[in-house]
């Protein structure tokens, strides 16, 4: 699938994550900003990549600003931002 527009999901509140996505032509680029990047950075990035793979997204610029979100919150925000960016009309229940 293709990213059609810039999109954003989440907040900068404690225990949340804000994910922004934009169209790209050079594969998937993830910029992670987090106070716990050293401990959990690989897991956060893996969760985002898992959602992108489920939607068959091959090109995207993604910025993730983590404020201590749990993995399930990160996944939910990633799904929301992709759904907005691809202008989905119906939810892809297989991804959930």
Curated annotation (Swiss-Prot):
Family of the protein in this entry: Belongs to the CitD family.
Gene designation per UniProt: citD
Localization of this protein:
Cytoplasm
Species name = Lactococcus lactis subsp. lactis (strain IL1403)
- Record's protein name: Citrate lyase acyl carrier protein
The record's section on InterPro entries has: CitD, Mal_deCO2ase/Cit_lyase_ACP
Protein's job: Covalent carrier of the coenzyme of citrate lyase.
Give one Pfam family, short name only: ACP
List every position bearing O-(phosphoribosyl dephospho-coenzyme A)serine.
14
Per the record, GO CC terms? cytoplasm
Q: How does it assemble?
A: Oligomer with a subunit composition of (alpha,beta,gamma)6.
| Keywords assigned by UniProt, alphabetized | Cytoplasm, Phosphoprotein
């Amino acid at each position: 699938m293709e990213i059609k527009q810039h999109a954003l999901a989440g907040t900068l509140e404690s225990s949340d994550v804000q994910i922004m996505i934009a169209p790209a032509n050079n594969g998937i680029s993830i910029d992670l900003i987090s106070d716990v990047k050293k401990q959990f950075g690989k897991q956060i990035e893996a969760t985002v990549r898992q959602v992108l793979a489920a939607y068959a997204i091959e090109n995207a610029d993604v910025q993730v600003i983590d404020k201590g979100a749990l993995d399930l919150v990160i996944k939910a925000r990633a799904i929301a931002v992709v759904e907005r960016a691809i202008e989905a009309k119906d939810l892809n229940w297989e991804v959930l």
